[in-house]
């Protein structure tokens, strides 16, 4: 999944 934190996007597998 992915989410946005502090203005950047992070993807998690």
Curated annotation (Swiss-Prot):
GO terms for cellular component: extracellular region. One of its GO terms (biological process) is defense response to bacterium. Plasma serum. The keyword Heme does not apply. Keywords: Antibiotic, Antimicrobial, Secreted. It is found in: Secreted. The keyword Secreted applies. Antibacterial activity against Gram-negative bacteria. This is Salmocidin-2A.
């Amino acid at each position: 999944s992915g989410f946005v934190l502090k203005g950047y996007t992070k993807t998690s597998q």
